[in-house]
Every structure is written in structure tokens, then in C-alpha cells.
Amino acid sequence: NKLLILSFALMQMTLFAQENKKVQKLDTILIKSTRIDLPFKENSRTINVVTSAAIKNSAATNVADLLQQVAGVDIRRRGTAGSQSDLYIRGGGFDQTLLLIDGIKMDDAQTGHHTMNAALPLEVIERIEIIKGPAARVFGQNAFTGAINIVTKKKLSNKVSINLEAGSFGQLNYSATVGKEYENTSIIAHAGSLNSDGYRTNSDYENNNYFLKGIFNKKNQPIEVLATFFDKKIGAENFYTTNPAWNEYEETQNSLLGVSTTFRTEKFKISPRIYWRRGQDIFLLKRDDPSFFRNLHITNKVGVEANVSYTSEMGITGFGIDISRFFISSDNLGNRNRTMANLFLEHRFTLWDNVDVTPGVAVTYFSDFKFNAFPGLDVGVQLTDNF
């Protein structure tokens, strides 16, 4: 009986200790993948967020490997170390899925096959927002089956990190990431290189990446400047053909330069942005004989956009305009250009404190296809505080 009483007393002490554990509240994530910024728990769209903690705890070494772990996202890869990959959401093709970096559209004038060439190194990513399902109403074309927004870090608090890896088949990876905080400025810089001789014939690669982000005038009107450059040289054995006599080879470049800021008042939020994106792709069917078959494509996109949200007693209204000019120079497609304009409008109504309705429309103009409209409606019901 004494043993039974002692065991019961220990069980009571254990239960008492569990009841006194502190509850840790997590920071609210404000979703930026929509025209209207909303806390994650209040958003009615099907959105997954890969947080910085999830990125840190993941075994993934690049964005392609990380996204492959998300249900509903299909990454089809060729080669290793993120050398080449195509992005699919819910069965849509790579031309139907849009990639954004800090809200900047990274669509390519030639093909969505180059979308993932713009993926950033994990060291500078704060989180990744994944919209599953039709998003053309929010982002226009190239987002018919979904969109992925990579949100970069704003500061690294005077940190320096260096990475060096070596392995079989001539593998050598190295990178450096630096964060510097000044009184009125934040700077993040990253440079890295992934190299290998390849585990089989013509599977070598050299992938170089550079990233620079600055936030200036932080105390008054913050201005963000973002610059990236990626250069890949890939032995593309059997990437596009199965003929063992052809040693395919590909070189790609992807660069981005963007400047943005945000103006805020009690009811208005205005976010203008200007950006330039460049892509280059060289493909050789025979690596040792460039004259046999060679494709060269150079694409440029220059754009300006502004997003506005207005909060009133009727709810939140989101309005956006995006005007861009595409250029392509190709020894196969020739020299072409196109002007595109997107106009977005949506309004979020809240009914009975637990029902939200968001109708909206996107109107897209192409200089060679004229106008197209993409209407849509989101409806959400909050059953409990957490569901």
C-alpha cells in the first residue's frame, strides 16, 4: 500500500509541473503574397509558409530541394545541387506557376523552364510563401495554378558566416554571407559557388551566385535595393536527348535589380517598385563542337508597379498596377518585344466577425494579344480562433 501511495504522489507532482509550463507565443506572420497584407491565420487562400526555422532545420541545401518537401509542389530536376529544375504546382506546367522574389515577378520572356534559375541561396531567405491554386486574379498571367514568393531577410545583425564543403568527384562548395548594421542602413551580402566534376560523363557543373540587399534611410522613409546574379555552367548529359554521342552543354545567367519603398498613413499603404530582370541561355548540342548546333537567348524585362491598400469601415480595398516591357534576342526566335500592363482590384468584406468575402479582378493587356480579364472570388469562414 505504501508503494502505491508513493507512486500516486509522484504522478500528482508530474501533472502539477506540466500545468505550470509557460506558453510561448509565436510571432504573427504577415502574408505578402497578396495585394492585401493579412495575418496568416486570417487569410482564406490556400497558402503554405516555409518559415526561417523550417529552413534552418531542413536537410535541404537549395530552394528546389526545400520546395520538393511541400505537398502539392512538384520539382522536376535535372542534374544535382539545384543545377536545373522546373516548378509545378497542382499539376500545372512551369509556364503556369509564377515565382516572385520580395514580390517581384521573375517570369521569363522565353520560357518558364528558366524560372528556378532565379532561386536564391537559403542563407538569405526569411521565408517562402506558397499559394496553391489559381492566383491569376492576384498576379495575372503565369500564376494560373499557383505562385511562390521568396521573402528575403531584412537584416543579419552584424553576422558573418562562411561555409566550405568538399567531397567525391571533385566537389567543392564555398560561400560567405555578411550582414552589417549601421545607424540608418542595413546591408546583406552573399557570394557562393558550387562545383563538381560530375559523378558520370558530362555531368559536371559550376554554379555561382551573388546577392546584395540594402535598406537605406531606415529611420525616415526606408528604401530597399535588391540585386542578384546567378551564373551556371552545366554538363547537360541526356537533359534533352538520349543520344550518347552528343555531349550536351548549357550555360544560364539570371540577374535582378529592384528598388522599392512603402508609404503609410492611417488608412493608406502605397508600395511603388521599379525593377529590371535579365536572363541568358546558351545551349550546345555538342559540347566539343559549338558550330554543330547552338541556341542563344537573351531576355530582358523592365517593369514598374505600385500596390495600394485602403482600410475603411467597409473593409480593405487592394489596388495594383504593373507595367512592363519584355525584350528577347535569339538566334532561333529572332528579335522581339512586347508591352504588358496589369490592373488589379479586390476588396475584402468581413461579415459577422467570422466570414470574409474577397471579390476581385485582374485585367491584363498585351501589345499583341490585347485585353484579358481574370475575375475571382475568395470566401472564408473562421470556425474557431485557431481554425
Regions found by a protein language model. Give the residues of each.
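Flexible loop and strand-edge segments within Gram-negative outer membrane beta-barrel domains
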Residues: 196-207, 211, 220-301
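Short strand-turn segments of transmembrane beta-barrel domains in outer membranes
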Residues: 147, 152-180, 190-192, 196-203
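N-terminal periplasmic "start-of-domain" segments of outer-membrane beta-barrel proteins
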Residues: 28-56, 86
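Structural signature of Gram-negative outer-membrane beta-barrels, strongest in the C-terminal barrel
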Residues: 227, 261, 314, 332-387
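Extracytoplasmic beta-strand/coil segments of soluble accessory domains associated
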Residues: 64, 68-104, 108, 126
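Non-catalytic regulatory/gating segments with a bias toward low-complexity or hydrophobic composition
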Residues: 55, 67, 128-129, 148-150
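Repeated loop/turn-to-beta-strand initiation elements of outer-membrane beta-barrel proteins
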Residues: 158, 184-188, 220-225, 233, ...
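Short acidic/polar hinge/loop motifs at secondary-structure boundaries
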Residues: 86, 104-132, 150-153
